Amino acid sequence: MTPLLALFLVALVGLPVAQALDCHVCAYNGENCFNPMRCPAMVSYCMTTRTYYTPTRMKVSKSCVPSCFETVYDGYSKHASTTSCCQYDLCNGAGLATPATLALALILLATLWGLF
């Protein structure tokens, strides 16, 4: 084997291998949903969106997305919602509450407190 070819093979072995992200992907009218799926190669985020129709009724949507912006919308004129993002395999499972979810819970409690 020529020295140049050997050097090329050593360089290839040292390169990191790109691996597709695994996320839960689903839309469910309930507390949570689980459906592990391999995302396309250009996807780098798992996203979870929770839309609250009432304090006890919500829709959870989970997906693979190429870019993601975490948001909290208080639902002044419509439904309240939160979007959270993460970047490791199956990170959008049940897990702990995200800061965005906690902030929305406080907003909903403050709104309910103001109604009584």
Curated annotation (Swiss-Prot):
Domain spans labelled UPAR/Ly6: 21-105
Lipidation (GPI-anchor amidated asparagine): 92
Function: Acts in different tissues through interaction to nicotinic acetylcholine receptors (nAChRs). The proposed role as modulator of nAChR activity seems to be dependent on the nAChR subtype and stoichiometry, and to involve an effect on nAChR trafficking and its cell surface expression, and on single channel properties of the nAChR inserted in the plasma membrane. Modulates functional properties of nicotinic acetylcholine receptors (nAChRs) to prevent excessive excitation, and hence neurodegeneration.
Disulphide-bonded residues: 23-46, 26-33, 39-64, 68-85, 86-91
Signal peptide region: 1-20
Organism: Bos taurus
Matching Gene3D superfamilies: CD59 (2.10.60.10)
A Pfam family recorded for this sequence: Toxin_TOLIP
InterPro entries hit by this protein: Ly-6/neurotoxin-like_GPI-ap (IPR051110), LY6_UPA_recep-like (IPR016054), Snake_toxin-like_sf (IPR045860), Toxin/TOLIP (IPR035076)
Entry keyword Cell division: no
Keyword field: Cell membrane, Cell projection, Disulfide bond, Endoplasmic reticulum, Glycoprotein, GPI-anchor, Lipoprotein, Membrane, Signal
GO molecular function term, any single one: acetylcholine receptor binding
Any GO CC annotation of this UniProt entry: side of membrane
Name the UniProt record assigns to this protein: Ly-6/neurotoxin-like protein 1
Subcellular location: Cell membrane; Cell projection, Dendrite; Endoplasmic reticulum
GO biological process annotation, one example: synaptic transmission, cholinergic
Quaternary assembly: Interacts with nAChRs containing alpha-4:beta-2 (CHRNA4:CHRNB2) and alpha-7 (CHRNA7) subunits. Interacts with CHRNA4 probably in the endoplasmic reticulum prior to nAChR pentameric assembly. Interacts with KCNA2/Potassium voltage-gated channel subfamily A member 2.
Domain of life: Eukaryota
Propeptide positions: 93-116
Entry membrane topology: Lipid-anchor; GPI-anchor
